[in-house]
Amino acid sequence: MTQGSRLYFAVTVLMCAFVSINGVGLNDLLERASQLSDKLHSLSTSLTNDLDSHFPPVGRVMMPRPSMCHTSSLQIPNDKDQALKIPEDELLSLARSLLLAWSDPLALLSSEASSLAHPERNTIDSKTKELQDNINSLGAGLEHVFQKMGSSSDNLSSLPFYTSSLGQDKTSRLVNFHFLLSCFRRDSHKIDSFLKVLRCRAAKKRPEMC
């Protein structure tokens, strides 16, 4: 079984785990969510490596700065120590806000992947569709976590995405695809970190053990 097949199998199992959750405790829900977020970040890293395998040098020059990511305006903790100081419901809202913000961008990436000027476009296309499916599954799982936590606040930040095209020429489309993916990879790491902190807190572990 290839690495991609193993990753797909593991994520599929985790997605199915969210289908029937009646009676499942908060600790188990957060464990499943953190495992799925970890797989999501691994998949985005694998996709980035695929793109980098044949990425034109000029693309590095054309690549927008990280501050141009559409989620960069969201105020989030910079490290684990800061995350540990944030209330659980706020931390969960941050993770859910980031997931929601990627619904439209991932739909765009999924629609563009098959026509990229890249020799690995079939693999990239397949993995991008996986990302889109998996982030929807994680979003549904976090809704269950939200309900289980019994929070009275459902304060999700709005992070609109206005781009409907990656560009007209093949280089621009490849560069913008790579840029969006790099933004998602960064955010998927944040989501994974937030969920691991929530899992740690639910298990009543000491902060230094998180």
From Swiss-Prot:
Signal peptide interval: 1-23
GO function terms (MF aspect): hormone activity
InterPro entries in the record: 4_helix_cytokine-like_core (IPR009079), Somatotropin/Prolactin (IPR001400), Somatotropin_CS (IPR018116)
Single GO cellular component term: extracellular space
Gene Ontology BP term (one): positive regulation of cell population proliferation
Lineage top rank: taxon: Eukaryota
Location within or outside the cell: Secreted
UniProt cross-references to PROSITE patterns, sorted A to Z: SOMATOTROPIN_1, SOMATOTROPIN_2
Disulfide pairings: C69-C183, C200-C210
Keywords linked to the UniProt accession: Disulfide bond, Hormone, Secreted, Signal
Note: The sequence shown is that of prolactin II.
Family annotation (PANTHER family): PROLACTIN (PTHR11417:SF5), SOMATOTROPIN,PROLACTIN (PTHR11417)
UniProt similarity note: Belongs to the somatotropin/prolactin family.
Protein known as: Prolactin
Organism annotation: Cyprinus carpio (Common carp)
